[in-house]
Amino acid sequence: RLLRVNYLGCVNTVLASYEYIKKSQGQILQFTSSSYTRGRANYALYSSSKAAVVNFVQAIAEEWYKTGIRINCINPQRTNTPMRVKNFGIEDLSTLLSSSEVARISLMTLLSSMSGEVVDVKLKQYNY
């Protein structure tokens, strides 16, 4: 199930959106995790699915370059979300990104001319 959601969900929605995105000159953002950079014990499928998303996005960016479609990955550091609380319990909020900060950087990415990039969102990294 994890691979279907994390990887195939990304692949299927990106490929299914091609004609619409091409016609509308839209962009695509996918989300990964810092786990994509290194496999972690007890997270083998999760880590590998996130690495697969990154490689897929980079490949599609190259394949679709001439169409003007831009596609990027957002890689947020540890973020304060209900799923994180469920999996890791209560943590010091000063060590976690807010979801609004991740959304702000996502919007900035959409406004950029980048394609095929992994945009790392780190705590107190951006001062715009």
Residue spans of the language-model regions?
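Active-site Tyr-X3-Lys motif and surrounding loop/helix of classical short-chain dehydrogenase/reductase
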Residues: R1-R4
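A short, exposed helix-loop element centered on a Lys and neighboring polar residues
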Residues: V14-L15, Q58
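A short helix-coil junction within the Rossmann-fold of NAD(P)-dependent oxidoreductases
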Residues: A16-Q25
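Hydrophobic structural elements of the Rossmann-like NAD(P)H-binding subdomain
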Residues: L29, I71-I74, R84
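C-terminal helical subdomain
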Residues: C73, T81, G89-Y128
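Catalytic loop of short-chain dehydrogenase/reductase
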Residues: Q27-A52, V57-K66, R78
